[in-house]
Structures are given as structure tokens and as C-alpha cells.
Swiss-Prot record:
Domain of life: Eukaryota
Pfam family, one: Voldacs
Gene name in the database record: LOT5
Protein's recorded name: Protein LOT5
UniProt GO BP: mRNA cis splicing, via spliceosome; spliceosomal snRNP assembly
Membership in a protein family: Belongs to the LOT5 family.
Location(s), subcellular: Cytoplasm; Nucleus
Keywords from the named record: Cytoplasm, Nucleus
Membrane-spanning segments: none
Provenance organism: Scheffersomyces stipitis (strain ATCC 58785 / CBS 6054 / NBRC 10063 / NRRL Y-11545) (Yeast)
Nucleus found in the keyword field: yes
Length: 282
């Protein structure tokens, strides 16, 4: 199971987060990989507003106490390599949404206004409770729009100061790039393999049963039969058996030089004869 959404009380800062351009310049060989030391920010900005939608009357939304009294019209967005952070500037806390918990993110235009639409899994921070039995996974819909109201300069994060051209479109593009770094945990559970695992399972090779059967009566005469008896039959691959003689024994010549042959058995009287013959050799 992947990481879950949670409440955080420390926003990304210059000590634990670096811009993507700087990270790519200093660590090109690890670009797009998760860093163990610092987070990487790909986008974001100040002066955004979010809205939790309740379009499904068959589901009840329950918000955790920390998010009940916060100002949803004044938030900052941090698009990190690991998650999307929605920081509530007035409450000094944030909602961290790992990309594995974001089912869908898309751009939507309504009355000439473009907003970012998110569909996330139900979590402990914002819970979706179905009124009855359903086959669908409980989810929450969130709308993020650009807030034209000027923000408090004291709330400006140094990581977002350089991103003066922040917009809904740039946030969407940054999320699309970062979400591609992470595998789908649901696909892993269903298939039993990791999306990033190079050792994927190969399809099984179907071998006709008559290829492995010693009885060749039912085999077409034009079809070559390779025997597999386990007696060094792979030493001469070009020697194709088309007769089906099961009494043949595969063998090969081995020059052992002066080495002893393990497993040879000789009688006691043969030892004296062999030693005498060896002494007569000049």
C-alpha cells in the first residue's frame, strides 16, 4: 500500500527542498529519481483557493477537526516530486496528497475560467462515507482555482518567489510530470509485479507434448524431433534424430591427460600389473 494523505505542520523550505532546475544541474544522473536527502519542487505558487465538492448525494463528507475552520480561499501549492502539498496560509498547516492517492488530475474550463480538478482517495483527513453498499472506491473531488486577491507578503515562501508566472496550467503540467515518477499501487496488487521492476514475468512457452514424448509414431515425418533424455543429448544439437531409436546413447570424447578418472573400479591384482607396465615404459 502506498503513502496516505496526512496533515503536516511544516511547509517545504530552502533547507529541505531544492528547485527541479538546480537538482537536475547538480545531479543529472539521478534526475527524476526520488532523493533521500531533499525534496524537489517542480511547481506551485501562492494565491490559490480550493473547494471540496460534494456532487454525489449518496456519500457523506467528513472533514477532520484540523481542516474544519481553515480558510480554503488562501492557500499555497507545492508540487513536489513525492506529493502535492496544499498549505493553508492562515492556519499554518497543510494537507499532503501523495501522488499514489490522486486518482485523477485534469484541467476544466467553466465560463472562461480554468480550474484544476482533483479526484483523490478517501482518507483520514477528508473521508467519504457511502450511504449504502457500492462497488466503487470512495473518493473526494477537489477544485483548485487561482485567487486574484493579493496575498500577505509574510506568507511568501522563498521557494515560490521565483515562480512568479505560476498558473493553473503550470501546476497541472508539474503534477503530470511528477505523477509519472510513481507506480500505480493498485496495478501492483492486481498483477503482483512492480511497474518499475525490470525483471518482469515472461510468458510461458507452450511446448507440444509429442516433442517430449519418446513415442514418435504420431509425429509427422517432415517434422524433426529433438530428443531430451538427459544423457548429454545437448552436445550435438545438429544431430537431429528422425528415426526415433530410443537405444541410442549420446557421448563425447574427453581427453583427460594424466588425470585420474573418478569412479573407475579396478581389482587388486590389476594394480600390480599396471604398475609393472608403467615401470617398463622408457
Amino acid at each position: 500500500m502506498g503513502p496516505k494523505s496526512r496533515i503536516i505542520h511544516e511547509q517545504p523550505n530552502i533547507e529541505n527542498t531544492i528547485p527541479a532546475s538546480l537538482y537536475q544541474a547538480v545531479s543529472p544522473e539521478r534526475f527524476s529519481l526520488e532523493d533521500d536527502d531533499k525534496f524537489v519542487i517542480y511547481g506551485g505558487g501562492n494565491s490559490y483557493a480550493i473547494q471540496v465538492l460534494q456532487n454525489d448525494p449518496s456519500q457523506e463528507l467528513v472533514v477532520c477537526p484540523e481542516l474544519e475552520s481553515v480558510d480554503y480561499s488562501n492557500v499555497s501549492l507545492f508540487v513536489l516530486n513525492t506529493s502535492l502539498i496544499v498549505w493553508f496560509n492562515s492556519a499554518d498547516l497543510g494537507l499532503e496528497l501523495p501522488y499514489q492517492s490522486i486518482i485523477l488530475h485534469a484541467l476544466h474550463t467553466l465560463s472562461d475560467d480554468t480550474f484544476l480538478y482533483l479526484q483523490i482517495l478517501s482518507n483520514e483527513c477528508i473521508t467519504s462515507i457511502p450511504s449504502g453498499t457500492t462497488e466503487f472506491v470512495p473518493s473526494i473531488e477537489i477544485r483548485i482555482v487561482k485567487n486574484d486577491k493579493p496575498g500577505n507578503p509574510l506568507n511568501d515562501n522563498p521557494l515560490l518567489v521565483h515562480n512568479s508566472n505560476s498558473s493553473i496550467e503550470t501546476v497541472y503540467e508539474a503534477m503530470s510530470k511528477c505523477s509519472a515518477f510513481h507506480f500505480d499501487s493498485d496495478s501492483e496488487d492486481e498483477s503482483g509485479t512492480y511497474a518499475f521492476d525490470s525483471a518482469e514475468q515472461t510468458p510461458a512457452l507452450e511446448i507440444p507434448s509429442h516433442w517430449l514424448n519418446n513415442n514418435v509414431d504420431d509425429v509427422d515425418s517432415d517434422e524433426a524431433l529433438l530428443r531430451n533424455t538427459g544423457i548429454a543429448d545437448d552436445l550435438e544439437i545438429d544431430d537431429v534424430d528422425e528415426t526415433g531409436n530410443v537405444n541410442e546413447v549420446a557421448a563425447m570424447h574427453v581427453d583427460v591427460g594424466y588425470a585420474s578418472i573418478a569412479g573407475s573400479i579396478r581389482k587388486r591384482d590389476e594394480d600390480d600389473v599396471s604398475i609393472a607396465k608403467a615401470r617398463r615404459v622408457e
